[in-house]
Structure formats: C-alpha cells, structure tokens
Regions:
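Active-site hotspot residues in diverse enzymes, especially metal/ion-binding acidic/histidine motifs
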Residues: 1-262
Length: 262
C-alpha cells in the first residue's frame, strides 16, 4: 500500500479534522500556543503532565521505537534512544496521542512511524497527531514564507532539510505535512517520497551531512532516563507485589542501564 493511501488527509478528511481539533485543544491546554515549534521540548511537555513519566534508554533494535505502559498505577512512555533524535521526538508525540485518547498499552515499531505497512487507523491517527503537534500549520506557513517557498517548484532538497532542522522531524513527516497543507499534489508528494531518507551516501541524510544542517537531530543520543520506575520496582519488592524472579530481573536490568550511563 502506497504511503499516501494510508494518509488520513486523503483517506478520511473528516477524521483529519477531528485530529486537528484534538491537537488544537492539547496545544491550548498544555503548550500555551497553537503555533509553537516544540522540537525536543516535547519531552518537557510530557513531563509536565501530572500522571505521566518518561523512560529513555537505548535498545539494540532500531526497528523498536517505544511504547506506552502502566506500572503500579503510574503511566510511562518508553523511548528507544538508539534511534536518531528526530525519531525519538516523533515517538514521544505519537505515544502521547495513545495516552491522551485511551491510555492504551501500545508498542511502536519503525514501520509504524514510516507508515510502511497496511493502514491501521489508530496508528495513523497517532502519526497525524504527532505531525500536527510538531509541525503546526501556521508555523509551517511562516517558515515557508521565510524560505521563499510559495509553490512546489520553489522546493529544493536544501530547503527541505532546513525545514527538517527547524521542526526536528523526519523527512517523510515534512513531505506529508506539505501535502496536507496542499503545497504538494499527490504526484509531487510521491516523487519526493521516492528520495532515500536514511542512505548516508545519497539522498536526504547525505545532504544533511554535506550541508551540516540538522545533524543534531540525526544523533543517536543513547540517553538514559529511568524516572521513578526503579523506585517503584524496589517498592514492589518490599511490598511483595511482584514475583522475586521478576524483581531480580528488573533490578539487574536497571543496574546495567545505570552502569552504561556512567
């Protein structure tokens, strides 16, 4: 299935408008503006939500992005920090949607972010929510004007990677947002999406390194943040709420993560 055939703007304009309203409500309630460019401030926004914590550490599986889970009554979003920073940011916004909608336990892989599999409406809505939150329409139009992009013919790879740097999002996210605001036609969008995004020898990643624009968002940060999960596991041990084998395994893993961070 073609990426555009899974894009909500094309598949269901009514659903698109609904998600737009959800993003606008969240921006007004938690961000303070509907045109603020968040970049990695998305993590601060998540941390400001009272009953939500973020856990971050690297996992040697770049197809595995993150997930939402509940542990002892507390909600956590896990993010794999072996991903490029831009995809960590997108993962955070994607999982935020699931938390806001229904607190659903949800595992996110790279195919879901890239939309390279059959349409899953909830996952597509989460991707759209993330894209609208990270690339607000008014902010995007303002940046297009600053870059003197008035029509599709004005777009160049250099301008695309500048937009990626400004909003700290992956290549496909920028291209799909340009389609959603109707700067690009379906055919033009497909032509842009045919360009390799992650090949370091050609395409977008090559141009990023060549021009040294937005390289910070390509870093695999390997950052470790355990929030209060370790304390919860220890408390569970003291209260005998978890099997001893599981507690030992969990604590061993967290000790290993702590050691890697040091």
């Amino acid at each position: 299935m073609d990426i555009l055939d899974k894009t909500i703007k094309k598949v269901s304009p009514d659903v698109y408008k609904t998600v737009e309203k959800e993003v606008l409500y969240f921006q007004n309630e938690f961000v303070g503006s509907d045109d603020l460019i968040l970049q990695d401030d998305i993590f601060r926004v998540l941390e400001d939500i009272e009953d939500l914590s973020i856990i971050m550490f690297p996992v040697e599986d770049e197809e595995f992005c993150g997930f939402l889970f509940e542990y002892r009554g507390e909600n956590f979003i896990y993010i794999n920090t072996l991903l490029p920073f831009e995809k960590q940011i997108f993962t955070a916004a994607h999982e935020l949607y699931h938390y806001l909608v229904n607190g659903k336990k949800e595992f996110l892989d790279l195919e879901t972010i890239d939309e390279d599999k059959e349409l899953d409406l909830e996952e597509s809505k989460a991707n759209l929510f993330a894209a609208l939150l990270l690339v607000p329409k008014d902010a995007l139009i303002k940046q297009l004007n600053l870059l003197k992009i008035k029509e599709a013919a004005d777009l160049t790879i250099l301008k695309i990677i500048k937009l990626m740097d400004i909003f700290a999002v992956p290549f496909k996210t920028i291209i799909l947002r340009l389609f959603e605001i109707e700067l690009l036609t379906e055919k033009q969008t497909e032509e842009w999406l045919d360009i390799s995004a992650r090949n370091p020898e050609k395409g977008i990643l090559y141009q990023i390194k060549k021009h040294k624009i937005g390289e910070r968002w390509q870093r695999k940060t390997k950052h470790v943040k355990l929030s209060n999960l370790k304390a919860l596991i220890i408390d569970s041990d003291e209260m005998e709420l978890l099997p001893e084998e599981k507690i030992t395994k969990d604590l061993s893993f967290l000790v290993e993560v702590d050691a890697d961070e040091d």
